[in-house]
Every structure is written in C-alpha cells, then in structure tokens.
C-alpha cells in the first residue's frame, strides 16, 4: 500500500470514480471542503452509523436515542458558553493573504520539532507560500454559523446552526429521564448534522463546515465519573479495532490541563495515523468528562430543575456527564484509509497485475455481494438476475454482466464487496455457482439453493 499521504490523493480519485464521494456544487465550480455522498458512499456512511447505533444503543439497556432540532433557541447557545467561548484564533499571512488557525500552525510545528516555537508565529513558515514570520497577530473568530428565524432578518430573529448535537441532548435530559423511566447511570445517544464555520477546513472529508456527529451523553453520579470515563475510553477504542482498524494506527492522546475546554475535567482523544501533511496523527473521537457543567448551567439559566433524585440513597444531585463524541465523516475516512490495499493478482492471461482491494469489514461494506453471470447471455443473465433479486431482500446486492469477468471482480474488490457469486454455463446443468471471497480470492462451488444460507453465515451482523 502507498503511504497514507499519497493514498489520500488516490482515495479521493477512487471515491469520485466509484460513487463514494463527490465534490459538492461541482458544476458551479464547487464549494471548498463541501462533499456529497454518492450511491456507494451513502451505503458505507449508513453502515458506519448503523454499527455505532447497534453498539451504543440497541445492544445496551442503559442508553436510549434522541433526534433533536438543528436550530435551537438562541438562549441554549448563550447558556452553554458557545456564543462567548466557541472561538478560534485567526491569523493571516501578509504575503499570500491566506488565513489559518494560529493554534493549528503552532501544533503542527510542535508535532514536527518536539517543542513549541520559541517566538510563536514569528518562527513559522506559511504552509501556502513559505514566507517566514509573515503572520498577523491572531484575533478571535466565532465558529458559529448564523441564520435567521422568522420574516425579519434582525437581531430578534438571530439563531445559530448547531455546532454540536450535545446541547440538544442536555436540554431534553429531564424529558428523557422521566418518559423512559431511566435511572442513573444512563445515556442518551444522537446522530445528526452539525455546522462549524471552520477557518481552515480540508483533508478531504476530515474537516468540513457541515458534518455529521455520533454522540452519547452518559449521566453518572459524581464520584463515579472517573471510572466511567475510563470505561468509555476503553470501550470506544475497542469498537474501532473490532471493525477492522489496525490498532497500530490508533493511539490515545491526553489533553493537557491548560488546553482543556471550559467544561472539561479531562478529555482523551482517540487518534488515527492519517499522515496528513505536517501532522501524522488526527483526532478520530473525543471522550470528555464534562462534569456537571452543562446541566448546572442550563438549570440555572432556564430556571428548570435538572437535578436527579436517587430514591435508593435518598439524595439529590446534578449528574456528571461522560461524552464519547465521534464524527461520521472522519470515521468513514478512517475505515477507507485503513482498508485500502494494493496487491497483485493474475489476469486472464496469467500475468500478474496490480489489484486494488478495499478490505472493509463486511458489516461496513457498501455492497455485500455481487452476482455476475460469466458473460452477457440469454440463458445466464436472467438466472443471475433472479438470484440477485432474491438476495436483495436481505442485503445490498449488485448485478453486473458488462465486460470480462476478471475486470468485474476487480471492480468489486475496489469497492470492498466481500463476495462475488458467478453464474456460468455449468450452472445450467448442475444448478451450482462459484462464490469468490474478496481478500483471499478463494473460490468455492455450492448449490444455487444454498447461496443465501452460505452468505448469511458469513455476513452476520450486517
């Protein structure tokens, strides 16, 4: 496999060509760091969300789901601290006039040199033009995207597109606790779109202004928060490993106390070795101990009692919150980068050729099986279509009869399809088909009547 820095360009090209991800608004010149998900991309993205929801909600008795609004009352963001504190340091190169986040520039320098720049931005070269010491003094820039609600665009109608899904959970905490009759410890999960006016979006779908989050707010008794925090760090790390991410490409990063968010007692990031230009590691998921900051703040600001009464101990308290927060888009990028493999396989003439394989866990693969008649034939194609239609009732299945069978295998390898089922002329005589496994390319001959059961045994959890 190529180095990940090289693989990124290859992956972007493959993503567009194979219908995973397209540049948004492309026919009008595009919009920076905006991407649309194509037919295969939306399947992969939905599979990522499905596996997360299954692990975090459906397989647990202590977490329930929620779907809150994208636009919340402005007071929510004032109370949470976002209006005042959701800001980033903006600096501009006076040579090329490109703008950057000052903290990202210094962090990249520190990652490369092992120490912060002695003279701050004055020691740094512009990533775009190379000019040294040409940066302006940083000024704070709000990451909130504004909109207006109602017929008049004035201060009275000012609202914000949510920068995170978490606040929608906090303001519904009491509703969920009472209606679902949950007892501490319990959690509320949500998947949804968020928006941030990023200064320097980029690295494909890693950092965008519109993105999707998968978050849980897990409410615990004060004093048990540190134990629960470690539990969620371990649990979330294992989720990625169980779905096929090479553990050597994962690490935990402890936020220094001086860099913690205003609400955090402790934050640990799960990082992946993306090998971006200037930065080997990038945040995949953050797990934060938010203490009682959010519920206390909203309780005080709204006048609503958000405390919890424990009947067993006859005590009342504001719960602490542990928050595992992941981005759907960068999680998808991680699975794609880690699965992308190049090896060699013989072509129809026996000559070895490069083969691109997306070694995705079958639970994530956009297409679970492809049904391929050996050739486009009046006898083979209808039989193959019938089998594909039958399998499609259980999984996402492709039918393809265009081109040489070897090229069709390669197309399916490239998008990560775990199994290809080939209908050939012998099938007309013995009612058997050939099933080819993606990674090993091993082939097995089975009865056409056994294909569904054969796949079901190998696609468990899909």
From Swiss-Prot:
It holds the Pfam family HGTP_anticodon. The keyword Cytoplasm applies. It catalyses: tRNA(Gly) + glycine + ATP = glycyl-tRNA(Gly) + AMP + diphosphate. Its EC number is 6.1.1.14. Its main location: cytoplasm. ATP binds at residues 196-198, 206-211, 283-284, 327-330. GO terms for cellular component: cytoplasm. The keyword Cytoplasm applies. Keywords: Aminoacyl-tRNA synthetase, ATP-binding, Cytoplasm, Ligase, Nucleotide-binding, Protein biosynthesis. Substrate binds at residues 101, 164, 211-215, 323-327. NCBIfam families: glyS_dimeric, PRK04173.1. Homodimer. This is Glycine--tRNA ligase. It comes from Thermobifida fusca (strain YX).
């Amino acid at each position: 496999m190529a180095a990940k820095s090289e693989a990124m360009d290859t992956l972007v090209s493959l993503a567009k060509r194979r219908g995973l991800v397209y540049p948004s608004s492309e026919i009008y010149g595009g919009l920076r760091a905006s991407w649309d998900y194509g037919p295969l991309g939306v399947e992969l993205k939905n599979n990522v969300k499905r596996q997360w929801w299954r692990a975090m909600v459906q397989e647990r008795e202590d977490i329930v789901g929620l779907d809150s609004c994208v636009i919340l009352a402005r007071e929510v963001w004032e109370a949470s601290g976002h209006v005042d504190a959701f800001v980033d340091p903006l600096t501009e190169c006076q040579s090329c006039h490109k703008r950057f986040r000052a903290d990202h520039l210094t962090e990249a320098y520190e990652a490369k040199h092992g120490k912060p720049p002695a003279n701050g931005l004055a020691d740094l070269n512009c990533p775009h033009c190379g000019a040294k010491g040409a940066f302006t003094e940083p000024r704070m820039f709000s990451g909130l995207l504004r909109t207006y609600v109602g017929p008049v665009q004035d201060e009275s109608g000012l609202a914000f597109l949510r920068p995170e899904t978490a606040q929608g959970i906090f303001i519904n905490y009491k509703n969920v606790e009472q209606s679902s009759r949950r007892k501490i410890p319990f959690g509320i999960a949500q998947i949804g779109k968020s928006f941030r006016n990023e200064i320097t979006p980029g690295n494909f779908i890693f950092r965008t202004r519109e993105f999707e989050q998968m978050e849980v707010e897990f409410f615990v008794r004060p004093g048990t928060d540190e134990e629960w925090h470690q539990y969620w760090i371990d649990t979330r790390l294992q989720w990625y490993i169980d779905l096929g991410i090479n553990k050597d490409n994962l690490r935990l990063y402890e936020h220094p106390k001086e860099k913690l968010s205003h609400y955090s007692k402790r934050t640990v990031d799960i990082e992946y070795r993306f090998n971006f230009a200037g930065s080997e590691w990038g945040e995949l998921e953050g797990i934060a101990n938010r203490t009682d900051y959010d519920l206390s703040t909203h309780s005080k600001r709204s006048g609503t009692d958000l405390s919890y009464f424990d009947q067993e101990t006859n005590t009342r308290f504001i719960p602490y919150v542990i928050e595992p927060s992941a981005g759907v888009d960068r999680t998808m990028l991680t699975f794609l980068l880690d699965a992308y493999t190049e090896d060699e396989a013989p072509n129809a003439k026996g000559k070895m050729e490069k083969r691109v394989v997306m070694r995705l866990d079958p639970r994530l693969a956009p297409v679970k099986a492809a049904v391929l008649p050996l050739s486009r034939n009046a006898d083979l194609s209808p039989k193959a279509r019938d089998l594909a239609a039958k399998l499609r009732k259980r999984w996402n299945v492709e039918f393809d009869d265009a081109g040489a069978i070897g090229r069709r295998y390669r197309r399916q390898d490239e998008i990560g399809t775990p199994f290809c089922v080939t209908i050939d002329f012998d099938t007309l005589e013995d009612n058997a088909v050939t099933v080819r496994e993606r990674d090993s390319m091993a082939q097995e001959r089975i009865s056409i009547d056994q294909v569904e059961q054969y796949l079901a045994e190998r696609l468990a959890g899909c």
